[in-house]
Swiss-Prot record:
This is U1 snRNP-associated protein usp106. Residues 233-264 are annotated as: Disordered. GO terms for biological process: mRNA 5'-splice site recognition; mRNA cis splicing, via spliceosome; mRNA splice site recognition. InterPro entries: Luc7-rel (IPR004882). Residues 233-258 have a biased composition (Basic and acidic residues). Component of the U1 snRNP particle, which recognizes and binds the 5'-splice site of pre-mRNA. Together with other non-snRNP factors, U1 snRNP forms the spliceosomal commitment complex, that targets pre-mRNA to the splicing pathway.
Length: 264
């Protein structure tokens, strides 16, 4: 939506609108120009109208400057693709962090559920102990064994206090409705876009997710970043190889000149 709005405004107010700053016309080398847009696609334009909407890019997007850059880059390497890669990988890294956090939250909820099960088992066991003590107290009272009955009464109060502590912990951990907690255990985290997926979702809902704008956007970011890094690293290796060959040729030429001068 942001990209479409930008194009409409440019059409209404002139094609050079986005080439202007307060100082006048700008060149694509100006730091105010978005290098991601020049080299490919700006992440700000990918996630519009999704929950990951980044808002409008603070830098200049101009189709004319993009064309100027593409023409100029045939004869000169400006290094902007490395800036583009850094921008892409920053957003991918942010997404990966959200995936890790989402996984941690999911695992934490599972641990909490296990703790609740443990607490409930302790409560049941404590309830049984309380029933046994009450039965024994009644028997002791009938036999007029007051001292033993008092000891049982003290133990009864301790168990009741302990049971209340267990119950209070269960209540505090169950502030989230049980249905939501149960559902949480059935969730998994998408390793592309960090969204939660339910293991109970039918094929249609899963298809809707995988064809959704946010999922496709992050899939595209990851693919572009992976391919661009491989391309740039191969280019660097090729350049280093050529530089090495050039240095060897220069050294060989220098050695030939030295040899010739000695012969002369």
């Amino acid at each position: 939506m942001a990209a479409e709005q930008r194009k409409i405004i440019e059409q209404l107010m002139g094609s050079n609108l986005s080439n202007f700053t307060s100082r006048g016309l700008v060149h694509f080398t100006d730091r105010k120009v978005c290098r991601s847009f020049l080299c490919g696609i700006c992440p700000h334009d990918i996630f519009t109208n999704t929950k990951m909407d980044l808002g409008p890019c603070p830098k200049i997007h101009s189709d004319k400057l993009k064309s100027d850059y593409e023409r100029a880059s045939y004869s000169h390497d400006y290094g902007y693709e490395w800036d583009y890669l850094e921008d892409l990988e920053r957003h991918v890294d942010d997404c990966n962090k959200r995936i890790d956090i989402a996984e941690a939250r999911r695992e934490k909820t599972k641990e909490e559920e296990e703790r609740i099960d443990e607490l409930m088992r302790d409560i049941i066991h404590t309830d049984h102990s309380i029933e046994v003590i009450i039965t024994e107290m009644e028997a002791l009272a009938k036999r007029k064994l007051v001292n033993d009955a008092v000891k049982h009464f003290i133990e009864l109060n301790r168990l009741k206090t302990y049971r209340k502590e267990l119950y209070d912990e269960v209540i505090s951990m169950n502030e989230i409705p049980s249905q939501a907690s149960t559902t949480h255990q059935k969730l998994q985290v998408c390793d592309i876009c960090s969204a939660y997926l339910s293991r109970l979702d039918n094929d249609r809902r899963l298809a809707d997710h995988f064809s959704g704008k946010m999922h496709l956007g992050y899939a595209m970011l990851r693919n572009i970043a992976r391919d661009l890094r491989a391309q740039l690293e191969d280019r660097e290796k090729s350049r280093d190889k050529k530089d090495g060959e050039k240095q060897r040729d220069n050294l060989a030429s220098f050695e030939d000149k030295i040899s010739t001068s000695f012969v002369a």
